[in-house]
Amino acid sequence: MTRTKKNPPLRVGVGGPVGSGKTTLLEMLCKAMRDRYDLVAITNDIYTKEDQRLLTISGALPAERIMGVETGGCPHTAIREDASINLEAVDRMLAKFPDADVVFIESGGDNLAATFSPELSDLTIYVIDVAGGEKIPRKGGPGITKSDLLVINKTDLAPYVGASLEIMESDARKMRGERPFVMGSVKSGQGLDQVIAFIERQGMLDV
């Protein structure tokens, strides 16, 4: 392990609209980082634990290291206005795995206005996808403008949906200013190294 156990675990929130690739990103991050870091993951769904099931089936982490939370209502409420259900889930996972280096918290499918409570997440990654249209970055919203890292996913689909990656990149730069963003296709691994490097650097995992 790279990180000393004297440090508290890094909590990384992963948000974005339904179908943007949040669960796939989380799966790929876990598979790429699990040999270097002690990881646990918490997923949010409104009425099911589908994302927990998908992560478990994919072998991202051992089943006991993945916890599903049923929010039973508006998904962004459970990560922002009343994050108690997720804070409790974090506490339960850390009681089982006190040496965890990173706690990944995936929100349920949400809108562009959703953000993570600072009580819940140290770093936030917001995922949008090219299939949603090239206009998405310029629509703004806290997820796009204020997240620590924006991931513009599924760039390989641009030719099929008539989206201009150049326009999306330009708009993302305008909306985010100095805040970083990554363009890629996480399912194929494109851009994944950049996301991991960001987590390690900003989360001081490599200290």
Curated annotation (Swiss-Prot):
Cellular localization per UniProt? Cytoplasm
Q: What is its main location?
A: cytoplasm
Keywords tagged on the record: Chaperone, Cytoplasm, GTP-binding, Nickel insertion, Nucleotide-binding
Identify the CDD domains for this entry: UreG (cd05540)
Any one of the GO CC terms: cytoplasm
Does the keyword section mention GTP-binding? yes
On the tree of life, the source organism's domain of life is: Bacteria
Which GO biological-process labels does this protein carry?
Answer: urea catabolic process
Ligand binding (GTP): 16-23
Single GO MF descriptor: GTP binding
One Pfam entry for this protein is cobW
| UniProt xrefs under PANTHER family | UREASE ACCESSORY PROTEIN G (PTHR31715:SF0)
Instruction: Tell me the protein family, please.
Output: Belongs to the SIMIBI class G3E GTPase family. UreG subfamily.
Under HAMAP family, the record lists: UreG
**Function, as annotated:** Facilitates the functional incorporation of the urease nickel metallocenter. This process requires GTP hydrolysis, probably effectuated by UreG.
What quaternary structure, including any partners, is listed in this protein's UniProt entry?
Homodimer. UreD, UreF and UreG form a complex that acts as a GTP-hydrolysis-dependent molecular chaperone, activating the urease apoprotein by helping to assemble the nickel containing metallocenter of UreC. The UreE protein probably delivers the nickel.
What protein am I looking at?
Answer: Urease accessory protein UreG
Q: Which organism is it from?
A: Cupriavidus metallidurans (strain ATCC 43123 / DSM 2839 / NBRC 102507 / CH34) (Ralstonia metallidurans)
The coding gene here is ureG
